[in-house]
Regions:
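N-terminal membrane topogenic signal
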Residues: 3-20, 60
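Alpha-helical transmembrane segments
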Residues: 12-27, 68-74
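Short, hydrophobic transmembrane alpha-helix segments
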Residues: 28-40, 54-62, 84-85
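Structural signature of hydrophobic alpha-helical transmembrane segments
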Residues: 32-47, 91-103, 174-175
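Outer-pore turret/helix-boundary of cation channels
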Residues: 33-35, 137-176
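Cytoplasmic-side transmembrane-helix entry/capping segments in multi-pass membrane proteins
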Residues: 62-73, 91-98, 119-129
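Pore-domain transmembrane helices of cation channels
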Residues: 106-151
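Pore domain of cation channels
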Residues: 168-230
Length: 238
């Protein structure tokens, strides 16, 4: 086995861990450089890496890989074309492609988690990536709702002055709101005002509860069974 092939195997075996790190970079780095044109480009580069690496994570399934590859080109294109100085319809397209692409990735992650027989480090990272991507997917939905209706959400305090000016800034605010809703924290600084926004927010809150009740419960049950089997094998026969 060559060094190159060995490195590829290591990357593939830790593909969900790498995706998790990239997602955290996309979420946590941009707010510290708000308003910077350079940071806007850096964010687009990081987000493109997330899109590309998300494709790499589904390489184990040919059908999903083919669909994701077909969707990747319009998703990356819309990411770079949509901007504060561009037409609003490009922001709609950008969010729509993100919804479809991340929806497919979430489908693969859910299938991977529910078909696994052992709880490994990568399975845990896959579960965390699944959770984060659900929030990003819903953030794109919320952004399109606000762009379409104009007043789908009510913003309190300083957010009221900042939100809704540019599609990119709006998406960042909606990522925050999406995580707050998915985790059912509900700070109250962003309030869904339109019926469509309320329904989508309620759906996300329910999915957040289902995630804990179903996904996490399954992983815990598999892990418990593994430990019981290991204990039974380690116990010497009478």
């Amino acid at each position: 086995m060559t060094i190159e092939s060995s490195a590829k195997n290591i990357l593939f075996l830790h593909r969900f861990a790498v995706l998790f790190v990239l997602l955290f970079c996309v979420l946590l780095i941009p707010p510290y450089f708000e308003g910077s044109l350079l940071m806007e480009r850096v964010w687009h580069v990081l987000f493109t890496f997330v899109l590309l690496w998300a494709l790499y994570t589904v390489a184990g399934s040919r059908k999903v890989l083919l669909l994701a590859a077909l969707m990747l080109i319009p998703t990356i294109s819309s990411t770079w074309l949509a901007g504060p100085e561009q037409a609003r319809y490009l922001a709609y397209i950008d969010n729509a492609t993100n919804i479809l692409y991340f929806g497919l990735i979430c489908f693969f992650l859910a299938s991977y988690i529910f078909t696994t027989k052992r709880v490994t480090q990568e399975v845990i990272f896959a579960a965390m990536c699944f959770y984060i991507l659900l929030a990003v997917l819903w953030a794109a939905i919320y952004t399109n709702l606000e762009l379409f209706y104009g007043n789908a959400f009510l913003f309190q305090g300083e957010l009221a002055a900042a939100a809704g000016i540019e599609a990119d800034d709006l998406f960042q605010h909606m990522i925050y709101y999406s995580f707050v809703t998915l985790s059912t924290l509900g700070y109250g600084d962003v309030i869904p005002d339109h019926l469509a926004a309320q329904n989508w927010a309620a759906m996300e809150a329910m999915i957040g509860q289902f995630y804990i009740a179903i996904v996490m419960a399954r992983l815990v049950s598999i892990y418990t069974v593994e430990k019981e089997e290991e204990a039974s094998l380690a116990t010497p026969p009478d």
